[in-house]
A protein has these predicted regions:
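Cyclophilin-like peptidyl-prolyl cis-trans isomerases
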Residues: 1-164
Length: 164
């Protein structure tokens, strides 16, 4: 499909950036897939990919860096780490095709209000992100809130490398 180039923000999100770079440097993302697409129907949404819990690929989880600490926000092009609960992020990430401010930390909200750890943004390849968002999903694949969001044909990540 093409190349997506990310610029990571190690100044504002040092823990999350270092974690992602460990996966890059150890080539743990090579051969994985973009396996999920949440399509809002208006060109917006997100794509998700990475290790998908493969025990041969995952590294220990990292501390959570909420957007209230980093000052980053979930706008179109943001790359962020997936997690179950705070402190469980490892080798899966998502990229936003549109602004989704609900993914930012919001301490005024009840429940799980710490958001997701944004740590960079797309500088090249947003057209590819949007093409993946628009790809067909399986109506039966996925569990819970992700049912129906799993790509019918996941997109292979050939390699992930530092550019300099």
């Amino acid at each position: 499909m093409g190349t997506i180039v990310l610029e990571l923000d190690g100044t504002h999100a040092p823990i999350t950036t270092a974690n992602f770079l460990r996966y890059v440097d150890q080539k743990r993302l090579d051969g994985t897939t973009i396996y999920r697409a949440l399509n809002f129907g208006d060109g917006g949404g997100l794509i998700q990919g990475g290790t998908r819990g493969n025990p041969k690929r995952i590294l220990p989880p990292i501390a959570h860096e909420p957007t209230t600490t980093t000052g980053l926000s979930h706008v179109a092009g943001t790359v962020s780490m997936t997690r179950f609960t705070p402190g469980t992020a490892n080798g899966d990430f998502f990229i936003l095709a549109s602004d989704i401010p609900q993914l930012d930390a919001d301490p005024s909200q009840p429940g799980d209000n710490v958001g997701y750890a944004a740590f960079g943004h797309v500088v090249e390849g947003m057209d590819i992100v949007k093409r993946i968002v628009a790809m067909p999903t399986s109506p039966t694949e996925g569990e819970g809130a992700m049912r129906g969001q799993m790509l019918a044909a996941p997109v292979k990540i050939i390699s992930v490398r530092r550019s300099n």
